[in-house]
Amino acid sequence: GRNGWLDRIPAYATRVVQDERTKDFTAQFWIPRPFDWSDDTFDIARHDELLIYEAHVGMAQERPGVGTYREFADRILPVIARDGYNTVQLMAVAEHPYYGSFGYHVSSLFAPSSRFGTPEELKGLIRRAHELGLAVIMDLVHSHYVRNLNEGINELDGTDHLYSPAGPAGDQPHWDSKLFDYGKPQVEHFLLSNIKYWLEEYRFDGFRFDGVTSMLYHHHGYVAFDSRDRYFDEGVNEGAITYLSLANRLAHDLRPSCVTIAEDVSGMPGICFPQEEGGVGFDYRLGMAIPDYWIKQIEEVPDEQWDIREMWSVMTDRLPGVKTVAYAESHDQALVGDKTIAFRLMDKEMYTHMDRASENLTIDRGMALHKMIRLMT
């Protein structure tokens, strides 16, 4: 071009590595032998009810440093299965330049993160999970992408509107990232082919769609949903609804038992309704009000005033016919500028009295309430 040559990573690169010396990311030509899936006939449909363990491969190890796919397969998966879970939800699968983003500032949507190992080692992790009877769900980030030019797809053709709306409309200011323009054919093709790729090449059993609320609305959900009009006015991103409907149709056409979960806090009607009834087609919605409720109880309400009827009401507050993933906490509460339920309950006492030889009322209370919260949820 007029300004000289510029090296960029292809949008569809399936292997991206970071140079240890320069720290630059580059695409790698990667053509391995066909992966041996052996007798992998696993089907998530065998599980009537999902018991989901959320995990980050890099942070799952006890040792200092970044964990690997192999370590996770050998050491962590057997523990998850032994503890009674039947599904693993993996964070930070697609490549991302900033490790501290927990995988949510994605740069290469088709490349599994090389920090944790090779693509074949990720496939080995999924094969091992299936051998243990565990389904594997990918935390899929199609709500935004990293604004970095060197590592990502931003301004890939020299403009700011190849994959995004032009100008400020293409920015997600709350997340310091770029938005997709779901009304563009090249965006639909890019993202839908990404879903097909992860399902067929890696045999994931489903997806948790991250940031669905941000996708559904041009205001990204930063308003009070105080009337029904909020779900049907000009703030709704119709292109995103079309894309999410196509995504669900494709995923379920490719694999009828595929599980799709929507991270939506707005309560958009129809998000989990069948497409034959005019819905978007998600199988589950995340029960995002539940963790906030437990935090409020712990921080603001004395133990003796916890109301069992109120707890039951919050746990069962959902639209008729909408299957909901209930959870006490996730990375949003435990990692992203917050703290775990256990730390809220036991605080600094955890560092000195988490052993059977110590008698400590703070620890005893914390453990009892922690068990009760998990049981209720």
Feature roles, as predicted:
Residues 1-53, 59, 64:
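The feature marks proteins involved in alpha-glucan
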Residues 203-205, 223-377:
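Conserved alpha/beta catalytic core and glycan-binding cleft of carbohydrate-active enzymes
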Residues 17, 40-52, 56-236:
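Substrate-binding/active-site clefts of carbohydrate-active enzymes
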Residues 1-2, 198, 377:
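Generic low-polarity alpha-helical segments
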Residues 5, 98-100, 105-106, 112, ...:
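Glycine-rich, flexible loop/turn motifs
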Residues 11-20, 97-99, 167-170, 283-292, ...:
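A broad, low-specificity signal for short, low-complexity segments enriched in glycine/proline
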Residues 6-9, 63-65, 100, 219, ...:
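Short acidic, gly/pro-rich beta-turn/loop elements at beta-sheet edges
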Residues 9-24, 63-76, 131-144, 182-195, ...:
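Charged, low-complexity, helix/coiled-coil-prone segments
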